[in-house]
Amino acid sequence: MVSVFLSTLLLAAATVQAYLPAQQIDVQSSLLSDPSKVAGKTYDYIIAGGGLTGLTVAAKLTENPKIKVLVIEKGFYESNDGAIIEDPNAYGQIFGTTVDQNYLTVPLINNRTNNIKAGKGLGGSTLINGDSWTRPDKVQIDSWEKVFGMEGWNWDSMFEYMKKAEAARAPTAAQLAAGHYFNATCHGTNGTVQSGARDNGQPWSPIMKALMNTVSALGVPVQQDFLCGHPRGVSMIMNNVDENQVRVDAARAWLLPSYQRPNLEILTGQMVGKVLFKQTASGPQAVGVNFGTNKAVNFDVFAKHEVLLAAGSAISPLILEYSGIGLKSVLDQANVTQLLDLPVGINMQDQTTTTVSSRASAAGAGQGQAVFFANFTETFGDYAPQARELLNTKLDQWAEETVARGGFHNVTALKVQYENYRNWLLDEDVAFAELFMDTEGKINFDLWDLIPFTRGSVHILSSDPYLWQFANDPKFFLNEFDLLGQAAASKLARDLTSQGAMKEYFAGETLPGYNLVENATLSQWSDYVLQNFRPNWHAVSSCSMMSRELGGVVDATAKVYGTQGLRVIDGSIPPTQVSSHVMTIFYGMALKVADAILDDYAKSA
C-alpha cells in the first residue's frame, strides 16, 4: 500500500514538474561558478560566450556524447528573473540592469556618446532584444557567396538552416484578421526556437489595418510573410514567444534541453581574455584560453580541437586583438605583440534609430505592432533623384574617406561592398528602411536606415583584457547618404501617420512635435536626426567573413585566416548588413557553422 502511494506521489510530482513554467527551473545551481573547477582541464571545444550562437553551437556539438564542451560566460543564467525578461511587452525595462552590457561609445558626431545595448548572461542579447522574427532578402544572402567569395553561403542553404532552427506557430483567426499573414512554406516547425504572434489578450487595434490601407493606396504590398526572402511592404510580424507569450531566449531554446548533459559544462561569472596559441609549421594553433575577472585572478583552460569565439560583435574582435591578431597599428598602440596581421575590428556596421510618435484617438485603442519595410523609392519619395545621384557619383569618395577615418583598410575592397549595396538599392528592390509601428494608445514609429555606408571600428586600448579598456566607434553619420536616408525615413513616418486611412486615428504628434516644423525639409529633418538618434544595436562585420583579399578575418567555415583551431561564430562575421532583424540569421548561421565543426571533428576522429 505504501509502495502504491509512493509511486502515485512520485508520478504526481513528475507531472507537476513537467508543467512547471521554465522560469521556475533552478538552472544556475547546476552550472559552474568556481573557476578552479575547470582551470587546467582539457575539453574538446571551448566556447567564449554563452549567447545566441554560443549556446546553439554548444547544444549541437554535445548531441554527440563523445564531444566535451566548455562554455565560458561573463554573466549568469537570467531567464528566470521575472517579467523584465520573460514578458516581451516589457522591452526596454531591462536596459541599464546587470543583464545589459551597456557599452559606451567614444564621442561621436556632435560630440555625443551613446550606449550600446548587449545582453550579459546565458542567452546573450536574446534576453534583452525586441524578439522580432524576420528574415533578409534573398539577394543579400546570395551576395555573401557571389560577391564575397564565401562558398555555400547562399539563400537556399541558409534558408534551410534558418527553418531548421524554428518551431513556428501559425496565427489564429483573430490574429489573421488583425493583420498577420503566414506562409507555411517559409517556416520550420520542428526546430528548437519557438516563434509566433505576440498577443497580450487585449483587443486588436485597427491602426495596423489602417497603415496597410494607407500604403496599399500608394502601391505598396501588404500582409506579406517577412520570412520568405523578400521583405517589402507592411505586415504584422512574428516574435520569439511560446504559446504562453513567454520570451524564448537562446537559453530557454538551447540550454534548458542540454545543460544536464555530462559532456557540457557551463562556467558563469568569468570572461575570456585571450586565446592561447602554440606555434606550428602551419602557423599558430589555438590550444586554449586565458579567462578570469582581473589581471591578478585568471586561469588557463585547454582545447583539444578548437576555440570558438562567440562573445558578440563588440567583444570577439577584442579577444582576437588581445591575443595578438589584428592590425599592427592597433596592437602597437596597446603594447600587444602582433602574432598575425588581419583587419580585425574594422568594417563594423550598425544602424541608427529615430522615433516619430503620436497620440491615438479612442477609436484606435488596442494592441498590435506592424512593420513597413520600405524600398529606396518609397523611403526617399521626391528626394529619390538626389539620393540616386549620390550613389552613382560618390562611391569612390566615400571609400577613400572611410579608409582615411579607420573604418576600413583598403579602398578598392571597400568599393566592392559599396557597389553591392548600390545594386541592392537601385536594381534589386531591397528594403532600405524599416518603420516599426507600435500601438496601444499611440502611433509610435521606431525607424532605421537598414543599409549603412558608414564603417565603424572597435579596438583595444591596453594589453590587459580585464581592464575593459576599448574604443567602440560606430562613426555614425560620417557618410552623408546614411544621414539623408535616416532623415527621409523619419519624414516618411510623419507623413504616413496623418494621411489616408491613418487620419481617423491620429490625435496629435508628440515626437518630434513642436521641435520640428510641420512641413520640414529633408535638411531640417537631418538636423533633427543628428540631435535625436540612437544606435540600433544591430552591429555586424567586425570580424568579416569574406575572402582575405576583400578584407576577411574568417573564411567560409568561420576559421580565422592563418590559424588552426580557432573560429569566430557570432554576429561579428556576416559580411553585410541586412534588411531584417538579425536573430533568424544568427541561428541559421550557428547551425551551419556547427555542421562545419562537426565535419572537421569527424575527419579528425
Swiss-Prot record:
One Gene Ontology CC term in the entry: cytoplasmic vesicle
Alphabetical UniProt keywords: Cell wall, Cytoplasmic vesicle, Disulfide bond, FAD, Flavoprotein, Glycoprotein, Oxidoreductase, Secreted, Signal
Biotechnology remark: Glucose oxidase of Talaromyces flavus is a major factor in biocontrol of verticillium dahliae, a soilborne plant pathogen which microsclerotia are 100 times more sensitive to hydrogen peroxide than propagules of many other microbess.
Annotated compartments: Secreted; Secreted, Cell wall; Cytoplasmic vesicle
Name the record gives this protein: Glucose oxidase
Induction remark: Expression is induced in the presence of glucose but not xylose.
Binding site for FAD: L52, T53, E73, S125, N129, G130, S132, V272, G571, M583
Organism, as annotated: Talaromyces flavus
Residues annotated to bind O2: K559, V560
Role according to the record: Glucose oxidase catalyzes the oxidation of beta-D-glucose to D-glucono-delta-lactone and hydrogen peroxide in the presence of molecular oxygen. D-glucono-delta-lactone is sequentially hydrolyzed by lactonase to D-gluconic acid, and the resulting hydrogen peroxide is hydrolyzed by catalase to oxygen and water. Glucose oxidase alone indirectly causes toxicity in the presence of glucose and is the active compound of the antifungal antibiotic talaron. Responsible for inhibition of germination of microsclerotia of Verticillium dahliae.
Family: Belongs to the GMC oxidoreductase family.
A biological-process GO annotation: secondary metabolite biosynthetic process
